[in-house]
A protein has these predicted regions:
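An N-cap/entry alpha-helix motif that binds or orients negatively charged groups
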Residues: 1-61
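N-terminal active-site wall of soluble small-molecule enzyme domains
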Residues: 45, 57-111, 115-154, 159-162, ...
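Active-site beta-loop-alpha junctions enriched in small/polar residues
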Residues: 51-53, 86, 113, 136, ...
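Structural recognition of alpha->loop->beta junctions
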Residues: 67-80, 127-129, 176-188, 231-234, ...
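Catalytic cores of alpha/beta
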Residues: 115-127, 166-178, 210-215, 219-238, ...
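Glycine-rich phosphate-binding active-site loops on the catalytic face of alpha/beta enzymes
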Residues: 125-141, 183-192, 233-252
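C-terminal helical cap(s) of enzyme catalytic domains, especially alpha/beta-barrels
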Residues: 196-206, 229, 244-263
Length: 263
């Protein structure tokens, strides 16, 4: 029986076919490596995410200005920025990506349900430094190419890959891939339930072999970061908690300055 992940992938295929990703816009990405930014961050390594809504919460932020949000995230110590470009379920847009790129010099991750090389072309055109690929999307056969081929296609465009998994089997296979960063999504994209223990369970049972592991979804406060870091995560992707804050920069500081505040 199809679940929400199937719906996401089917809608992504339709969005590609409808021409959503056809654009002539071009913005220079700069030589910004998300991998390097996370590994060398002087703060808690956070990828801050720009999005207006989510399937689980609905509207998160109604009238945000992408440039202003990106600048506030940068001022708050973000190592990198993720921009949702998926339009149907996350309220994302290609315009938000382009506007964020023009506003800051941080590495930018294009966050979408990517299954076509055309989406990689757009990521490059709009100034992304990295893209998200979801292991389960390719396991279910939605990719126009196989996962390893899509990673190669991203690398041929000088795009780094954050490869997302949700269970031990997926994570073990992601370790064998050529992905630059490994993501663990605490949200089950089939049922939309969230459990921070997903990261803990996976990293207790699978050796990450020194790779940067980004824990994603469900992070609300500093205690969550401490729990996930103790569990073995090395970086963190946070969206809703930041986008719903009255003061984005202050909220960013709550996350990025954890170690400094404890000294």
């Amino acid at each position: 029986m199809p679940d929400f992940l199937d719906l996401l992938a089917q809608d992504a295929k339709t969005t590609v076919e409808e021409g959503y990703y056809d654009t002539n816009a071009k913005f220079h990405a700069g030589n910004n490596s998300m991998n390097n930014a996370l590994s060398k961050s002087q703060n808690m390594p956070i990828i801050a995410e720009i999005k207006g809504m989510s399937p689980s919460r609905g509207i998160i932020s109604k009238s945000y200005i992408p440039e202003n949000v990106a600048i506030a995230m940068a001022n708050g110590g973000a190592a990198g920025i993720s921009v949702l470009t998926e339009p149907k379920h996350f309220g994302g847009s290609l315009s938000n990506l382009a506007r964020a790129r023009q506003a800051v010099n941080l590495p930018i991750l294009m966050k979408d349900v990517i299954l076509s090389p055309l989406q990689l072309d757009v990521a490059l055109q709009l100034g992304s430094n990295a893209v998200l690929l979801i292991q389960a999307v390719f396991d279910r056969g939605y990719g126009e190419l196989g996962l390893s081929e899509m990673i190669d296609e991203a690398h041929s465009r000088s795009l780094e890959v954050l490869l997302e998994s949700h269970d031990e089997n997926e994570f073990e296979r992601s370790l064998k891939s050529d992905a630059d960063l490994l993501g663990i999504n605490n949200r089950n994209l089939g049922s939309l339930t969230v459990d921070l223990n997903v990261t803990k369970r996976i990293l207790e049972n699978v050796n990450a072999k020194g790779k940067i592991v980004v824990s994603e979804s469900g992070i609300k406060n500093a205690d969550d970061i401490k729990f996930l870091r103790k569990s073995g995560a090395t970086a963190f992707l946070i969206g809703s908690a930041i986008m719903s804050a009255d003061d984005v920069e202050s909220k960013m500081n709550e996350f990025t300055q954890i170690e400094k505040l404890e000294r």
